[in-house]
């Protein structure tokens, strides 16, 4: 679509976004660099906030743009503008802006080139400024002291509000083969944690005692790894294991009638798993005899959703664990068994789906538990 000039194009884009649901809008629309910063880049923030910057660099937020799964998904259709607003939430990160839809079709956006597009900033995905900059002003939780740049104290940073702009996004698009089913916020709201005063920040950004910036006093700050399933977006790039304790609690005991398994959603304030409907968690039990040979058939329990995507998305089942929900099983003992191995793992997608998308070498799963039980 023909440009009407940078200012007019920005105004048209803002008007369009204002007409859309929250999760279809960018988090920040301004381009003004806050006083005290050299640029909007994470590296500019990281010059002082060194530990936070190092945590962010290996987080899934930092890899939200270059994630290979995301790249193949947005290449399928002209609906990518729907996804950009969470994966690259600043307008300066987007090469084109939607200013309207042809026949109200989300796959036929009217686009104008963004004259302020910053490719390097786009590569940072969900970067510092995505959450902390609003119209040229740095926002934060308010730690006190005398920061070298102005900070607007913002209560959203102590609540779930910022997170749910993207992690509570549910929508159907009739006649389309895609849907948006990120219901994490509602899952949390329906669970026990709100009454206990715990929100997204409480678990996903645990407290640490350290300076917020170089030369500052030791104080209570928040870690910026954002706890999750622990499946890397890029092989070898991930937070340390302690940053992602598994949501699943798992115990196993050998009894006369079989191996007793107890599985509980112990640490996730939402369903386990949550978010992407293709994710699942599984528990597998295998048996061996005294010679180390496999006996009997493996037993498996899967926690996840079942969907078909053609001709329209349809959900067929949901076996996920609600917050603090527990389930117990007795796995029969095969003849000759003397040892049982219980392995739990978290999965991003199936090998079949990864093959379809030509995602060879893409990290698909992570083991979370391995238990050995004997009589």
Positions of predicted regions on the chain:
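Short, aromatic- and glycine-rich surface loops/edge beta-strands on solvent-exposed regions
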Residues: 283-285, 337-346
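Active-site neighborhood of thiol-dependent amide/isopeptide-bond enzymes
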Residues: 81-84
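Short glycine-enriched loop/turn motifs at secondary-structure junctions
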Residues: 38-40
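A long-range scaffold signal marking pre-active-site subdomains of enzyme folds
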Residues: 42, 50-54
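Primarily the internal scaffold of c-type cytochrome electron-transfer domains
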Residues: 2-36, 55-78, 92-322, 328-333, ...
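Long, hydrophobic/aromatic-enriched structural stretches that serve as scaffold segments
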Residues: 86-89
């Amino acid at each position: 679509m023909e440009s009407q000039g940078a200012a007019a194009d920005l105004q048209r884009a803002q008007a369009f976004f204002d007409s859309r649901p929250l999760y279809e809008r960018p988090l920040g629309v301004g381009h003004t660099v806050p006083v005290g910063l050299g640029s909007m880049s994470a590296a500019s923030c990281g010059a002082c906030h060194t530990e936070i910057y190092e945590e962010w660099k290996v987080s899934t937020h930092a890899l939200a743009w270059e994630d290979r799964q995301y790249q193949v998904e947005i290449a399928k259709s002209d609906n990518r503008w729907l996804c950009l607003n969470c994966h690259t939430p600043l307008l300066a990160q987007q090469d084109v802006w939607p200013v309207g839809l042809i026949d109200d079709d989300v796959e036929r956006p009217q686009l104008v080139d963004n004259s302020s597009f910053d490719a390097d900033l786009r590569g940072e995905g969900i970067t510092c400024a995505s959450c902390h900059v609003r119209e040229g002003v740095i926002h934060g939780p308010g730690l006190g002291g005398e920061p070298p740049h102005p900070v607007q104290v913002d209560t959203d940073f102590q609540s779930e509000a910022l997170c749910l702009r993207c992690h509570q996004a549910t929508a159907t698009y009739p006649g389309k083969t895609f849907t948006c089913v990120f219901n994490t916020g509602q899952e949390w709201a329906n669970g026990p944690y709100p009454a206990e005063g715990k929100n997204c920040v409480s678990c996903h950004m645990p407290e640490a005692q350290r300076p917020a910036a170089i030369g500052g006093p030791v104080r209570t700050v928040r870690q910026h790894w954002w706890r999750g399933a622990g499946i890397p977006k890029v092989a070898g790039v991930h937070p340390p294991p302690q940053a992602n304790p598994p949501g699943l609690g798992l115990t196993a005991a050998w009894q006369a009638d079989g191996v007793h398994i107890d599985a509980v959603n112990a640490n996730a304030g939402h369903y386990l798993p949550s978010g992407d409907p293709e994710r699942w968690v599984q528990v597998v039990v295998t048996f061996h005899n005294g010679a180390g040979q496999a006996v009997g058939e493996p037993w498996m329990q899967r926690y996840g959703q079942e969907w078909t995507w053609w001709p329209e998305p349809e959900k067929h089942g949901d076996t996920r664990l609600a917050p603090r929900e527990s389930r117990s099983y007795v796995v029969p003992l095969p003849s000759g068994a003397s040892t049982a191995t219980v392995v739990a793992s978290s999965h991003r997608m199936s090998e079949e789906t990864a093959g379809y998308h030509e995602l060879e070498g893409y990290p698909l799963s992570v083991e979370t538990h391995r238990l050995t039980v004997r009589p």
